[in-house]
Amino acid sequence: MDLPGPIHDFLLVFLGSGLILGGLGVVLRINPIYSAFSLGLVLVCISLFYILTNYHFVATAKLLIYVGAINVLILFVVMFMNSSEYYKDFNPWTIGNGLTSLVCTSILVSLISTILDTSWYGIIWTTRSNQIIEQDLIGNSQQIGIHLATDFFLPFEFISIILLVALIGAIDVTLQ
């Protein structure tokens, strides 16, 4: 999206704060329904980030797949479970949670220090698909495939990893 600088910066800060608050809501909420709504906020903010960077196809796919299907499925599963018995005797701070918080905080600090120390100007992420194949010689479905393999490779891989984690989590919930 071609926006003026101050508006673009404001939207980045607004979406980033919504993403952070939604992520904290997913982790810190005791009620799983509120946690699922916070997850929906996180997914919508991520889709809006993709719209700001002119990746409209990935944003639409993320909204349809994650918010429209997976988050609604999570809400249905949570509502069908008797969730009041799970968080009635909930103690949020145990030794395991403290250790997990310490590990996650150290990973976050190392990621932030790595991001700040990296020179991002010399990094070329992907090659443009119009340099590989002439776009007028191929159809729309082939263009989508080429874009997924070149321009949207990293987001596509991140989506597949998130789907794998969701599948493992569903299996874990089913076996308990």
Swiss-Prot record:
Its EC number is 7.1.1.-. Its main location: plastid. InterPro entries: NAD(P)H-Q_Oxidoreduct_6, NADH_UbQ/plastoQ_OxRdtase_su6, Nuo/plastoQ_OxRdtase_6_NuoJ. The chain crosses the membrane at residues 7-27, 32-52, 61-81, 93-115, 151-171. Pfam families: Oxidored_q3 (PF00499). It is found in: Plastid, Chloroplast thylakoid membrane. One of its GO terms (cellular component) is chloroplast thylakoid membrane. Keywords: Chloroplast, Membrane, NAD, NADP, Plastid, Plastoquinone, Quinone, Thylakoid, Translocase, Transmembrane, Transmembrane helix, Transport. GO terms for molecular function: NADH dehydrogenase (ubiquinone) activity; quinone binding. NDH is composed of at least 16 different subunits, 5 of which are encoded in the nucleus. Belongs to the complex I subunit 6 family. NDH shuttles electrons from NAD(P)H:plastoquinone, via FMN and iron-sulfur (Fe-S) centers, to quinones in the photosynthetic chain and possibly in a chloroplast respiratory chain. The immediate electron acceptor for the enzyme in this species is believed to be plastoquinone. Couples the redox reaction to proton translocation, and thus conserves the redox energy in a proton gradient. This is NAD(P)H-quinone oxidoreductase subunit 6, chloroplastic. It comes from Gossypium barbadense.
